[in-house]
């Protein structure tokens, strides 16, 4: 035990730590305070000094040592102060230029954002303008139900009853052939399925044996202008329905006997039933 205590001090990297050296690590031992670097006082420039420095900065942003010393003698300041002033002045100038560029970009960007809603509004107005003609054409169709004269009902047959005159749309038919009749009316039908749209019923229901009120007129199934002109004279308008398995909305006791043939069209009004005869298939509709 005694031999262990008498061993030489432990060596670290060739340096022996003695007991006296260990005392330096004790808390009670005071260490010499490091000298604190004193802060340099801020230099204040007068108006005359700033005028001289600004005049030199206007000539050159990077003056050499001789120019700085000459100006330092004029303003009674050390050359190091003049050098620092030019350094700060260049940094300030770069900052102002960057702010101007950013400000210009920020002004341009909102203008781009403002133009995009204008384009959207114009596109919306364009789309609404495209859909406005159908709405304008539908207005005279609604107002045409009060006209007193029938254009397709023959004189020998009474027109349909009042419930049919309450609706504002007429029947529109399409057939795959074009029929030209002896009475001088040209009717073109396209498509295989028949349906009821907003077109003139007189253009499709007027038979070849009955003449319309307007002599020599050519009835087009897709002409909306002719539709409105004929509807202004007709009190009868049929509701928009699919012409197929569904029944027709006839509230009158009159019946429509419609025969579809390749060479002739016949329209008859009977008393109790609606009989629709076709070559390919037979459909019978009766009002209950």
Curated annotation (Swiss-Prot):
Drop me one GO molecular function for this one. sequence-specific DNA binding
Arranged from A to Z, the UniProt key words for this protein are:
Developmental protein, DNA-binding, Homeobox, Nucleus
Q: Describe, from its UniProt entry, the tissues in which this protein is expressed.
A: Shows a localized expression in the dorsal region of the marginal zone at stage 9.5. At stage 10.5, expressed in dorsal bottle cells of the dorsal deep zone fated to give rise to prechordal mesendoderm. Also begins to be expressed in presumptive anterior neuroectoderm where expression persists in subsequent stages. At stage 14, expression is confined to mesendoderm and ectoderm cells of anterior dorsal regions.
Q: Which Pfam families match?
A: Homeodomain, TF_Otx
Where does it localize? Nucleus
Bias (Low complexity) ranges? 95-106
Question: CDD domains under this entry?
Answer: homeodomain
Q: What does this protein do?
A: May play a central role in the initial events of axis formation and in particular in specifying anterior head regions and their spatial relationship with trunk structures. Activates the head organizer gene cer1 by acting synergistically with siamois and mix-A/mix.1 through the 5'-TAATCT-3' element of the cer1 promoter. Also binds as a complex with lhx1/lim1 and ldb1 to the gsc promoter to stimulate expression.
Q: Which family does it belong to?
A: Belongs to the paired homeobox family. Bicoid subfamily.
Put simply, this protein is called Homeobox protein OTX2-A
Record gene name: otx2-a
């Amino acid at each position: 035990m005694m031999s262990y205590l008498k061993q030489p001090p432990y060596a670290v990297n060739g340096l022996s730590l003695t007991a006296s050296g260990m005392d330096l690590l004790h808390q009670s031992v005071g260490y010499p305070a490091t000298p604190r670097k004193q802060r340099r006082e801020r230099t204040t420039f007068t108006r005359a000094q700033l005028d001289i420095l600004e005049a030199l900065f206007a000539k050159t942003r990077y003056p050499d040592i001789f120019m700085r010393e000459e100006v330092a003698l004029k303003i009674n300041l050390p050359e190091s102060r003049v050098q620092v002033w030019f350094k700060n002045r260049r940094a300030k100038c770069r900052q102002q230029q960057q702010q101007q560029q950013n400000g210009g970009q920020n002004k341009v960007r909102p203008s781009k954002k403002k133009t995009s809603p204008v384009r959207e509004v114009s596109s919306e107005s364009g789309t609404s303008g495209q859909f406005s003609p159908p709405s304008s054409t539908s207005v005279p169709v609604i107002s045409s139900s009060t006209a007193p004269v029938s254009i397709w009902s023959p004189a020998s047959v009474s027109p349909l009853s009042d419930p049919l005159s309450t609706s504002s749309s007429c029947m529109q038919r399409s057939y795959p052939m074009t029929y030209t009749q002896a009475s001088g009316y040209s009717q073109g039908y396209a498509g295989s399925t028949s349906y009821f749209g907003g077109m003139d019923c007189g253009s499709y229901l007027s038979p070849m044996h009955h003449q319309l009120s307007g002599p020599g007129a050519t009835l087009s199934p897709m002409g909306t202008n002719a539709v409105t002109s004929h509807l202004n004279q007709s009190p009868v308008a049929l509701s928009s329905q699919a012409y197929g398995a569904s029944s027709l909305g006839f509230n009158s006791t009159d019946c429509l006997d419609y025969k579809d043939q390749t060479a002739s069209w016949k329209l008859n009004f009977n008393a109790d039933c609606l009989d629709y005869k076709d070559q390919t298939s037979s459909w019978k509709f009766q009002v209950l």
